[in-house]
Regions:
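An amphipathic, aromatic/His-enriched active-site/gating alpha helix that lines ligand/cofactor pockets
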Residues: 14-33, 40-52, 94-100, 122-156
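A short acidic, often aromatic-flanked loop/helix-cap motif at beta-alpha or helix-coil junctions
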Residues: 32-34, 44, 59-60, 166-170
């Protein structure tokens, strides 16, 4: 499975989605930008996409939700360690209230992995961040065993981008 991302105006992203109704696409609206996400086992219809291979997934992406993309630049030598960590994740997030889906994305021609999660709304995501499941998933952060303490894994600082879909979910209104 692959995910392709492209950016443009809200109008163009919506028209592209409407043109390809048989494809699994979700329009995401963020701070000052709009992204069209295409999930497929085949080729994309985008002319200049950002390409990702899905390493791990759970749940079905929904056209009505709150998307959180944790963008993590990883060095070439750090890829095996980083991927191993995510292949052994606890999978506790799937049981959190408001959780819809997760995709762990390996970049095809770039260095930035994306951990994409979809929630019913921002309050669900924020509740997860204060949950025991979150603390368990991040318990080694900052310790000698934490992946963040290993030299040369990350090529630069990670950053988070958030998006909503055109149809507002109940707790994003």
């Amino acid at each position: 499975m692959n995910i392709y991302l492209t950016s443009g105006t809200p109008e163009f992203m919506n028209s592209l989605k409407e043109k390809h109704t048989k494809e699994k696409m979700v329009v995401l609206h963020g701070e000052g930008n709009t992204v069209l996400l295409h999930e497929t086992t085949g080729k994309t219809v985008f002319s200049t996409p950002r390409k990702y291979e899905v390493l791990d997934s759970s749940g079905e992406l929904n056209e009505q939700g709150y998307f959180v993309l944790n963008n993590i630049p990883v060095s070439d030598e750090g890829r095996p360690i980083f991927e191993h960590r995510f292949s052994n994740r606890a999978r506790a997030i799937e049981n959190e209230p408001g959780f819809i889906a997760i995709r762990v994305l390996r970049p095809i021609k770039a260095d930035t992995y994306i951990i994409l999660t979809e929630w019913t709304g921002p309050s669900s995501f924020e509740a997860w961040q204060t949950s025991q499941a979150y603390n368990k998933a991040h318990e080694k952060r900052g310790s000698d065993e934490g992946i963040d303490q290993r030299p040369n894994i990350f090529s630069s600082a990670s950053y988070v981008t958030t998006y909503t879909t055109a149809k507002k979910s109940e707790d994003t209104q």
